[in-house]
Design a protein with these regions (language model features):
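Membrane-interface junctions of multi-pass transporters
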Residues: 18, 46-93
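Radical SAM enzyme [4Fe-4S]-AdoMet core and its adjacent flexible, acidic
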Residues: 1-42, 47-57, 100-109, 161-164, ...
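Core AdoMet radical
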Residues: 134-144, 155-199, 211-230, 240-262, ...
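Recognition helices and adjacent regulatory flanks at domain boundaries
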Residues: 97-135, 145-147, 168
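Short, intrinsically disordered, charge-biased short linear motifs at domain edges
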Residues: 9-14, 66-79, 133-140
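Detector for the c-type heme attachment site
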Residues: 90-94, 152-158
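Long, low-complexity, intrinsically disordered segments
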Residues: 504-510, 528-558
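N-terminal pre-triad scaffold of radical SAM enzymes
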Residues: 30-43, 127-155, 214-218
């Protein structure tokens, strides 16, 4: 049922959540993100992922969600104990009350309110060992993708993998300790193409039961249209006699750059899905969009967007913008294009979400010097003022062309550019961000055949003024070499049974090129104190990846 009419989120919390316990969250039972490529799972995007047990899913395919670790967390939540992996919410809830005396509302409220009261009551009283079916699921079958966006990395793009395998890791990046560009992220896809994947197999064995109760499945990647599993899912919607298929929402994150035959199959498949949503992405126009999202062709992408808007069957079309240092140069022109689409297809095609990039920090908009940030701040402010003054409405739907929630997001971006100084709490000093910005894009141009100066003429004076720093490699925790052995700082992390993310050791150790933290427990290191022969591969624990933030990584210490 969710909130009653007129009920605030605080009142909902008092009615539905607090009577269960001080730490209850419905997402631990009914929501999951699952990376089937390497077997990682988590209940929302705040806790780090943990590894699915290969032995357990042989007899219980639902264990791709109902892991022993999640059951431990459910038990804690029923008792009112706080899992430490959920510290994002606890930090919010421990903040002071506002001036009106209201306690802050954390994400666990928003992630619980979407479920029916009856389902939450069931979860509150279930034995923790009981297996539950999901209500909402985000899933990635693999990382296959034909794009290699500048701020993406090999964990999510096979084209990025090709870059690293062909050219080696990016050199000289000093500030960003997240390992985005070190190696080909072998942990993200341990199975070769065509090789049996037990996690994908478990998903399809669970699907007949899961599909009876699932309310929403969102498929991400990589690029979902490039994996056979998505067409198996499309066929299920077309052929199934499962009654819930008429109620289930299917959403796909797609870059809409699939070639003609695949796009044809995609559009045809939507005709058989009653509740379909597509989420696509862009944030600049023309050559700048093509530079940021390497592999995108602006003319093809805009044409295929319109073809989808015209021919597909859908409930929603969504534009996910990733706001980075480069897109601000033509962002208002991109919004103009979005408004033109809204005029043609309705105020909701597309719906625009503004998501500010924080990692890698040197590609954040906050890397830009003050004078450029002010220039873009003023341009965006002027654009929004003009749109508000026009007050344009859709001739098709009668609704405001730019919805209030979209205006709010753009307003937050304007404020962000004006007020916020660093992308995240661990951000390096500004001169290091500038150094990395230039070091990265010089290599990016060479590898990808681009020309930064030609593509972003308004940034050239600043770009050319950046000095590449002579910083000792002793301070470079991302210093892979294209050949031979390197000394790299490794941070070994685990997620304990109590949900605490722990860094159990940090040290410098030589490693071979292409070797990642997933090889940390290889037998050749058996003399080392932290060697564990029972843990061979860790979900998302590639060197430098901050599992406490990025939502990929860790292994359960059981």
């Amino acid at each position: 049922m969710g909130r009653k009419q007129g009920e605030s989120h605080r009142e909902y919390k008092a009615r539905m959540i607090d009577p269960v316990s001080d730490s209850f969250c419905g997402a631990k039972w009914y929501n999951a993100t699952i990376w089937l490529g390497h077997g990682g799972t988590t209940s929302c995007h705040h806790p780090p992922a943990h590894q699915i047990d290969l032995e357990e899913i042989k007899t219980n395919p639902s264990a791709i969600h109902n892991t022993r670790h999640k059951k431990k967390m459910r038990d804690m939540m029923q008792k009112g104990d706080r899992p430490k992996e959920c510290e994002y919410c606890w930090k919010i809830e421990d903040m002071e009350k506002d001036s009106d005396g209201n306690e802050p509302v954390s994400d666990r409220v928003y992630k619980t309110v979407i479920y029916e009261d009856e389902d939450l009551e069931t979860a509150a009283n279930l034995e923790p060992s009981f297996d539950v079916n999901l209500k909402t699921l985000e899933i990635a079958f693999n990382r296959t993708c034909q794009l290699a966006c500048s701020y993406c990395n090999p964990a999510f793009s096979s084209t990025w993998v090709k870059d690293i395998r062909t050219n080696g890791g990016y050199q000289g990046i000093k500030s960003d300790a997240r390992g985005h560009f070190i190696d080909d992220a072998p942990y993200a896809e341990p199975f070769d193409a065509g090789e049996f994947n037990p996690y994908v197999d478990a998903f399809w064995r669970w699907w007949p039961e899961l599909s009876k109760e699932l309310e929403e499945i969102r498929v991400t990647g990589g690029e979902p249209l490039m994996t056979p599993s998505i067409y198996k899912l499309f066929d299920w919607f077309k052929e199934t006699d499962e009654p819930n298929a008429k109620n289930m929402r299917l959403a796909i994150n797609s870059n809409l750059m699939a070639k003609g035959p695949l796009l044809n199959k995609f559009i045809d498949a939507t005709q058989h899905i009653p509740h379909f949503h597509v989420y696509t992405s862009c944030e600049a126009i023309g050559s700048q969009a093509e530079y940021i999202r390497d592999g995108l062709d602006w003319e093809i992408w805009t044409s295929q967007f319109e073809r989808f808007a015209t021919e597909a069957r859908y409930e929603g079309v969504h534009m996910m913008m990733t706001i980075n240092a480069l897109c601000l140069d033509t962002i208002t022109e991109f919004w103009d294009w979005c408004l033109e689409m809204k005029r043609k297809y309705g105020h909701h095609v597309p719906g625009i979400s503004v998501n500010i990039l924080r990692f890698p920090s040197f590609q954040s908009p906050l890397t830009l010097p003050d004078h450029l940030r002010k220039m873009y701040h003023d341009e965006i402010s002027d654009w929004l003022d003009a749109v508000r003054e026009r007050g344009e409405k859709s001739e098709l739907t009668g609704a405001e062309l730019l919805q209030p929630w979209e205006e709010d997001q753009i307003s937050r971006l304007i404020e962000y550019l004006d007020v916020v100084k660093t992308p995240h709490r661990n951000t390096a000093e500004q001169h290091l961000l500038h150094h990395d910005f230039k070091v990265f894009y010089e290599q990016y141009d060479s590898r990808r055949g681009f020309d930064f100066r030609k593509t972003f003429p308004r940034l050239v004076d600043w770009y050319d003024s950046i000095d590449v720093l002579d910083i000792s490699d002793d301070h470079d925790i991302q210093a892979p070499d294209s050949v031979g052995v390197t000394n790299t700082l490794y941070a070994k992390r685990i997620v304990t049974e109590d949900g605490e993310v722990k860094v159990v050791e940090m040290k410098v150790r030589g490693r071979q090129t292409g070797e990642s933290e997933d090889d940390y427990d290889d037998e050749k290191y058996k003399e080392e104190a932290d060697y564990n022969p029972n843990i061979k591969r860790k979900a998302g624990s590639s060197i430098g990846w901050d599992t406490t933030v990025d939502g990929l990584g860790g292994t359960v210490d059981e």
